[in-house]
């Protein structure tokens, strides 16, 4: 990817220290701009820190380590535990918003129960689960969360609306996941739509049949929605990168591409 020469001396503020924001900072710095990254959490990486928790995934943290090494060398100022105020943004010549996304919960009866948690909270250590867990959503996050739960000693069922579990998973990893599921007797419900959550079970429809799936806990892994940042009153050009841009960034490569693109437009 070609990094264009900068358009004069500019100060760029990056809001968000996930992979997209960090790549945007790298590219902006290489273009000769003064760059400040503001991350409200105490660590860089954003959702990578959650994605690295399931089995075999910790290697992806090397992407964060790379940016932690290269950005200071490029003169990028990193502000952890700090939110970018509108005053900070207006003091820059351009702002790149890279504030990520948040996980979704199904709007069905029982979804607000004490026995229901999100996969992101489970992986982040914010929610404790035990016993028989029903994971709603058999995509990448759902299957990886299921493996994590197996590692923690839980019994797991995976419920997926489509006709295949782990659709889109790497062909090198999928056989390992399926073997793990088989070894732990993971019940897989495909073509199954959840209609309600009750104490001790999930109600669902599989084809024309109404079924009941027993469980102690329900873990939601049904996708994400972009975060919004209030930029009303920000009077400098604002660009977007990563999940919050509305573009799907389901991989590190896509997040990097989004960060590069945003920084190259300034």
Predicted regions mapped to residue ranges:
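Ferredoxin-type iron-sulfur electron-transfer modules in oxidoreductases and energy-metabolism complexes
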Residues: 1-6, 71
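Rossmann-like dinucleotide/flavin-binding elements
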Residues: 5-40, 44, 79-87, 91, ...
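Rossmann-like dinucleotide-binding cores of NAD(P)H-dependent redox enzymes
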Residues: 37-74, 146-192, 246-248
